[in-house]
């Protein structure tokens, strides 16, 4: 497994953060044997939007327009698989994300930012992956 550079919250708007997160996202997808060509474009708009807009605006736009976020504007089209990959990858590159995907989903459910029905849909996809890749449950993906 690759050693990843970790970033603070203040560093998340930088190109190096985006690059290391992109590497981690694609590595997790490969490790779980679910990599798809569209993963090459993961978060690709962020460094370019960041050249023009402040980070908070880029972050809000990104979450509304990308299927791997709970805030995605078409909830019925969310990609739970990509969300799992993203949350697993975040733990590799952010100091502020110590949780793995299932821990993050439970946290969001408990804080109210994830509905019980969303959690159920997420859990079905996560459980199928965890059955094939037990390391998901052990926080070592």
Map each language-model feature to its residues.
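Metal-dependent phosphohydrolase cores
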Residues: 1-141
